[in-house]
């Protein structure tokens, strides 16, 4: 969270944490938010492979992958997060989702759909 942003009610900023327990509680809260957002993203990936099946499109679209990485790096820089960290995380996530899409597409094609 940017230093000038106000914390939502009940949420401590890093500077407001007075103990390691409070820091860990906030990290756990942030982790829940991250997983919830990954679940939301996965819903879109789920829809993407269905559309790709209809359009006979590939799961792996390198230009799109790079476009996503470039956007994430820019957002990271704006937020003061190391762009290399976010790129590494997103490349891992994109790779996992590509494999997921490929398995789904292969399963549907083999099933004759």
Locate each region found by the language model.
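Domain-level signature for soluble enzymes in the chorismate/prephenate branch of the shikimate pathway
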Residues: 1-113
């Amino acid at each position: 969270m940017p230093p000038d942003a106000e914390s939502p009610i009940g949420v401590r900023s890093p500077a407001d944490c007075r103990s390691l327990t409070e820091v860990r509680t906030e990290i756990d809260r942030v982790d829940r938010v991250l997983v919830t957002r990954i679940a939301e993203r996965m819903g879109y990936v789920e829809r993407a492979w269905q559309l790709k099946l209809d359009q006979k499109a590939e799961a792996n679209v390198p230009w799109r992958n790079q476009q996503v990485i470039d956007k994430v790096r820019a957002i990271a820089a704006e937020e003061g997060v190391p762009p290399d960290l976010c790129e590494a995380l997103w490349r891992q996530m994109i790779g996992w989702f590509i494999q997921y899409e490929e398995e789904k597409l292969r399963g549907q094609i083999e099933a004759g759909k």
